[in-house]
């Protein structure tokens, strides 16, 4: 008779593997997420590098629009300053600009969003599909959200940057909270001016700022 009380053994590395899979899925934007996932884990089991299709190859294989900062700016303008947006409404906006449904679903899954979505969090994860690294992701988010419309360096309120960096680092799971806190404290005390704004160069060109 088969034993039913045998404890299930969950490998300690599983949570990290699942996070890496979720991030890879956002970046790859596969047309068939299930098949892509099967190929991904099969490659891992053989000790091989998981499959990642180039963005140009993806665009050639489908009629979806390519995700760009410009399209994210359009979505941001349509959200019109709201902090919370309903998933159904955002899905419709996403569809109107012809972005891949699988990418929308991947962002929803990684962010664990339900019926009501915190727009800045969704935007940050969507930008991570373009940014790859945390620094590049935050650069793109700043460009999308920039309150400078006179052709200057993209800039956003430091409070917004603080929220986004903390969230992205938390989702990434590979950066300790103490490092995030240390970087934010340095930027706030040594970099931010009286206007309370942070520019892209403040965290991409400053050798003392390392967000990764």
Swiss-Prot record:
Keywords: Cell projection, Cilium, Flagellum, Phosphoprotein, Ubl conjugation. One of its GO terms (cellular component) is motile cilium. Residues 12-49 form the RIIa domain. The keyword Ubl conjugation applies. Residues 209-212 are annotated as: Interaction with RHPN1. It is found in: Cell projection, Cilium, Flagellum. It comes from the Eukaryota. GO terms for molecular function: protein heterodimerization activity; signaling receptor complex adaptor activity. InterPro entries: ROP_DD (IPR047844). CDD domains: DD_ROP. Sumoylated, sumoylation decreases upon spermatozoa capacitation conditions. One of its GO terms (biological process) is flagellated sperm motility. The keyword Ubl conjugation applies. The modification Phosphoserine is found at residue 56. SUPFAM superfamilies: Dimerization-anchoring domain of cAMP-dependent PK regulatory subunit. Belongs to the ropporin family. PANTHER family: ROPPORIN-1-LIKE PROTEIN, ROPPORIN-1B. The RIIa domain mediates interaction with AKAP3. 'Ropporin' comes from the Japanese word 'oppo' which means 'tail'. Homodimer. Interacts with RHPN1. May interact with SPA17. Interacts with AKAP3. Interacts with FSCB; the interaction increases upon spermatozoa capacitation conditions. Important for male fertility. With ROPN1L, involved in fibrous sheath integrity and sperm motility, plays a role in PKA-dependent signaling processes required for spermatozoa capacitation. This is Ropporin-1B. It comes from Homo sapiens. The lineage of its organism: Eukaryota, Metazoa, Chordata, Craniata, Vertebrata. The gene is ROPN1B.
